[in-house]
Every structure is written in C-alpha cells, then in structure tokens.
Amino acid sequence: RSLREIRIGTLRYSEPIASSGLIASIGGLYAEARPGGIIRPLDVRSHVASISLRLRYPLLRQRNQSLFLEGGIAANSTQTDILNTRLISDRQTVIDASLLWQQSGWLDGTTTASLGIYHGTGLFGAMSRSASHPSVAGFDPRFTRVSLLGQRLQRLIGPFSAYASVQGQYSK
C-alpha cells in the first residue's frame, strides 16, 4: 500500500477548569484519501476536516463508578471528487449532549452505558437543505439524532475475557 492512499492527522488538547472536575477540550482531524487498486483510474479524492470544542463534567465520582455530563460542538467538512468532478460536498455543524456511566468491579467486569442527543445547526457555514452535492439526497442539516450505547467487558477464567457491545440510534 502507498502512503498516498490515506493520510490522517488528529490533535486533541484537554485542560481542567477549576477544581470542580470540569474539563474543556479542543480537537481537530484532517484526512485525505486517494484509493488505488481497481478504482485508481477514477482518480477518487476525498478530504475530511473537523474541529470540535467539548466540556465534560463529573456528576458522580466514586471508586467503582462515574457519571459524566458531556457536551460540545463540532464543525465537519467532507468533499469527494471523481475524475475532477465534485461528487460529495458536506458541511455540518453539530451540537451534542450526552450522559456517560462507567462502572467497574461488579462480577469482576466493567460496564459502560451512554445516551446522547445530537442536533445539526446552521452555524459556521453548515450547508443548507438546497446545497448541491450532499452525501444523502434530501439531507436536512438541522437533523436530530439520539444514540444509545452499552458495553460490557467480562473477565472469564485465566487470561480470557468476553466483550459485548450494543448500539442503537434514532434519527429524525
């Protein structure tokens, strides 16, 4: 594989705010893809960029469990060209809030559960409903999505463990 096929860079910085446990973070991502193989003659080129600001606050902190309230805003951009013709051009700004519960020790395992709500906005140059080249026809940039996640890592006998994960989402 060539290093030209995919390149990804991410940065994240977190800083505690006061003594309450509040943590602020900023993150960024940039990725380029130029697939080879049998689609190389199509000259597919994709570019993805994202920047996010987040806050995380501990509602409950105990030795064996924690409950966090987290929220943030992310501005995302995706562009894909084929044969020098724009196929996809998405720009989204998403505000989100979630509750995250983490527990360890019960039956010698760890459990994580989260509930999140995400809402698309028109901020920071987000595309409109009439934008050309969206990745999904009729895409509404002011969408709402609710997601659920449950994970369990269970220690078994000796060096063995089992992992299970369940996720679901509803979009409107």
Language model features with spans:
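Transmembrane beta-strand segments of outer-membrane beta-barrel domains in Gram-negative
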Residues: 16, 21-171
